[in-house]
Amino acid sequence: MVDDVISKGTSPECGKSLTYVGPSPCDLSHGYQEPIGMTVYKRRFIGVAHLALLNIVVSWGWVTYPAVPVTSAVFLNVSVNAITWLSTGTLFAYCISAPFVFQTVERLGLRGSNMITSVLLLVGNWIRYAGTASEVKNYGVVMFGQIIIGLAQPFCLSTPSKFSESWFTDKGRTSATAIATLANPLGAALGQFANPYLAKTPDDMPRMILIISSISTLAIMPSFFIPSKPPTPPSTAAAVDRTGLLVALKDVARKRNFWLLSLPFSIYVALFNSTITLLNQAVIPYGATEEEAGIAGGILIGAGLVGAAILSPLNDKFKWYMGTIRSFLPITCAMYIALIFAPASTLGIWPTYVVCAILGFSSFSTLPVLLELLAEITFPHSPEIGSTISWFGGQIFGAVFIIAQSAMVAGPSANPPYHMRWSLTFAAILSAVFLPAPLLLTLVDPGALRRREQWHNTSLETARDSA
């Protein structure tokens, strides 16, 4: 049902309040488009909730085994490093399917993208369950299931910006993008919190996988019923005709300000992926239990969700994009440095909890802002182009970082054995190296921001002048 109508400008023919897309109705020159009434629908909330649900279960699938690395290793009769590879394999699988998101959304729409996510999730989860059954315990089958889940992830993680532009006005886009996007790390938080309690012993592993697979099966059902876009667009930005894929990619590749955002975005996403994957191994050598390590991971994500919930509505209203980035990215960098020392603190696990809370709050506060800025910079191209490229970089760098940081684990003769001090130092250095780039965005190109709003205002002025 329609819950709100946004009226901008006046038709000179009938006097009806409408928002014009392109020139005035009096302009019969090339490129004339009929005016379109801009409308938003209540069903958009169902759509964003379902997209969030898909991101929750796909991320929960990613961290299923790394959340309980020792228990998983004992059950599958493999090393802890092999369990880490279940996470790494998922990230590499993401990179295989990510390039297909562009054509999928263009040809099948958001509904088609969600359906592909759902089918792959269904198949991947139940293959994992088959590999984890007590009679089988086959690491290869489990890895195959993880890879299929990884193939599903880009079809729901790269599309929130597209969904928010298709269904929401500029007063709600940042919040909608945040809800759907940050549901992905929420799924990882659920895994960090719940899995140590669902699988307290190796014999509990089949039951844990059965529960996760059942929840995922229920979560995918609405994919087949939610449409790709509303009957009428919510804003002029959503109504713009998009350029072809190859033209868009060539144009985006030439935008310096795009790379100033996209590359740091990819690096910071990769650092989060490696941190959430290796956090257990970073704190356990200092005496923490798997449950305490899981709580640390949950705090990392939970505090981030709180930060995003506070700042996303404020950014929708006040557009504090650059202020948010300049305030919170340096804090994020400082917390990666603090994480080097927190696990070894004589105060136990509590300093790690504090660092994880601040790191999560600052990281997640900037994530939806960065995605919205990417959509602004790449406009009038489709929003999923910038987000897919950036998420692709985050996943592939994340996989590389996990491999590199796993190789930096200290040996059995270290104090304490198998500590990850050098791995955490590696992450801190990377966060510092890529910090300056996004802070320089408006200095390099002052017109990079709010281009959709500028185009929107220009359209209204054209309509009024013609009237």
State where each predicted segment sits.
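Juxtamembrane intracellular "pre-TM" segments in multi-pass secondary transporters
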Residues: 30-41, 232-261, 458-467
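Glycine-rich segments within core transmembrane alpha-helices of 12-TM secondary carriers
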Residues: 172-200, 216, 391-402
